[in-house]
Amino acid sequence: MHTVRLDRTHTGSILDIGGGGEGIIGRLYGRQVTAIDNRREELDEAPEGFEKVLMDACEMSFASASFDHVTFFYTMMFIAKDKQRRALAEACRCLRPGGTLEIWDAAFERAEPFVTELAVYVAADRIDVSCGVWEEGASQNLLRFQEMAGGLSLSEEVCEEAEGHFYLRWRKNTA
């Protein structure tokens, strides 16, 4: 089981892509969060306390530069490989200059299927989460997302990798 510890570090508005289900970012930041998910049942399952919107990450209806932060918390594995670059580009479009874009996810060579167990600590609460991909042939790794971010007016700030999981944070360029 992989452990993720989250603390409140952001001020301002947060767009959480794939924020249904356990609603981890929404639990942490509450009303600061607008969580989108393309599955109604995931949004219905998420706890209350933050805005939830049914929306596709590749075609967001938000105005450009609408959010101070954009997060993907174990979401990319659920976005088809051929749509991930578009989702990142849309996230960057919605991000204000100087804002941060963050990805937490798992690296895996091949889904046959792939399942990972997480112990997520949100303040003093522990939330056990299972994430899995059943699409045969699916794979992802840190390097792929670093390459995808190229050309998106982002400067890499943090890159951490441990136990088959990774965390990336970029800041959107101001000019």
What are these regions (language model features)?
Residues M1-T11:
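Conserved alpha-helix/loop element of class I SAM-dependent methyltransferases that forms part
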Residues L15-E59:
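Class I SAM-dependent methyltransferase SAM/SAH-binding core
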Residues C58-V70:
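A short acidic, Gly/Pro-enriched loop at the edge of an enzyme's catalytic core
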Residues H69-K83:
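A short SAM/SAH-binding and catalytic strip from SAM-dependent methyltransferases
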Residues R85-P97:
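A short glycine-rich, Lys/Arg-flanked "PGG" loop and its adjoining helix->strand segment in the class I
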Residues W104-C159:
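C-terminal alpha-helical "lid/dimerization" subdomain adjacent to the S-adenosyl-L-methionine
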Residues G150-A175:
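Core SAM-dependent methyltransferase catalytic element
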